[in-house]
Amino acid sequence: MLDIKQIRENPQLIQERLNSRNGTYDIQPILQLDKQQRELEATRSQIQARSNEIGKIVGQKIKSGINPQDPEIQALRDEGNAIKAQLSELEPREKELKAEIEQLILALPNLPSDSTPIGKGEEENVEVRLWGDEYLPQNPNIIPHWEIGEKLGILNFERAVKVAQSRFVNLIGAGAALERALINFMLKMQTAAGYIEVSPPLLVNTDSLTGTGQLPKFAEESFKCADDELWLIPTAEVPVTNLYRGEILAAENLPIYHCAYTPCFRREAGSYGRDMRGLIRLHQFNKVELVKVVHPSTSFDELEKLVGNAEAILQALKLPYRVINLCTGDLGFGATKTYDLEVWLPSSGKYREISSCSNCFDFQARRADIRFKEAGKKGTQFVHTLNGSGLAVGRTMAAILENYQQPDGTILIPEVLQPFLGREVL
């Protein structure tokens, strides 16, 4: 959530930075309502001051011995009653204006950082580095992961459609075991890196989704329970970040690192016709998420470390990947800066996103009201929050099924996963 004071004091800069994003955002309605609200507040303050003054005068006169029924006192009381009636009309309108302003600000995305490249879309993202050329598969006849998975009997999409609908999958036998091995391996790596594991609720309330920025803008992307004010989580970022909603943390307890494995649920309303086959874009998928709550002075350094934690998984699995600095036009709603990790999928000859690591600055902290206090100092500040996948499990499995695919149709198991699976080949 953007700061109304920042919008008010730097309207041109704010509008320019919003214009660099993909979308149309206009801060003028906010400025107009803010002007009305502040004028109303000033009027109310003046009237309230007069009401306080009248109360003081009446009290002094009665204390000095003047009869409470004296015409002068009665006139002051009449004026005071009229002011109270006026205030009772002004206060609801002021609250209404504040609520309107808040709703408009909630619809605005975060401001891109100075180190985020300017661009209109993904074609203008900037490649930061490539890793793993020596691990590019030499098999010239690699087939897509969904085909090899079905041939091996470890993936079944047809029966998942029968049970649910399209964009679901059944993992069977060694497929389910491989997924479980990946989850355990990822959690082991991240807890060793200092993250504290959390097993959070998979259903969250509206305030939680608003706090991390999914609501109100992306309601159509989420699954909502029909009879309850609860939503299935699109990512563990939501429940884990909201652990601290409405709290004031001690500065000495920062940074806070959490990792969480959860199923994630997304309607994929805007992706009709894309990635209809395979594990890339599902309504339900598993992911290990990394979340950081940090001091504002360290958040960009923490982002680099977060990316390194996600990269460590890919490097341990020896999966070729690249790191991309997303441009302003491709930046997520709540992020000020994002690095995407894209893994190599040889069947399509493309790198595909497997992790998105973002610094959200104080955007989520303002929405969720997460603050911290320095010992011995007055006042509080908003924390900075970061999140990233460490990693998306289904996409990691897809990358293994393709990059480790052998000419005879078998799949070698990455060495680091063999202790979890008790086998070397699928």
From Swiss-Prot:
**Keyword line:** Aminoacyl-tRNA synthetase, ATP-binding, Cytoplasm, Ligase, Nucleotide-binding, Protein biosynthesis
| Record field: catalytic activity | tRNA(Ser) + L-serine + ATP = L-seryl-tRNA(Ser) + AMP + diphosphate + H(+); tRNA(Sec) + L-serine + ATP = L-seryl-tRNA(Sec) + AMP + diphosphate + H(+)
Q: In which pathway does it act?
A: Aminoacyl-tRNA biosynthesis; selenocysteinyl-tRNA(Sec) biosynthesis; L-seryl-tRNA(Sec) from L-serine and tRNA(Sec): step 1/1
- The EC code for this enzyme is 6.1.1.11
What name does the UniProt record give this protein? Serine--tRNA ligase
Q: Which Gene3D superfamilies match?
A: Bira Bifunctional Protein, Domain 2, Serine-tRNA synthetase, tRNA binding domain
What subunit structure does UniProt give? Homodimer. The tRNA molecule binds across the dimer.
Which species? Nostoc sp. (strain PCC 7120 / SAG 25.82 / UTEX 2576)
Location of the protein in the cell: Cytoplasm
Amino acids binding ATP: R266, R267, E268, E353, I354, S355, S356
> NCBIfam families, per this entry?
serS
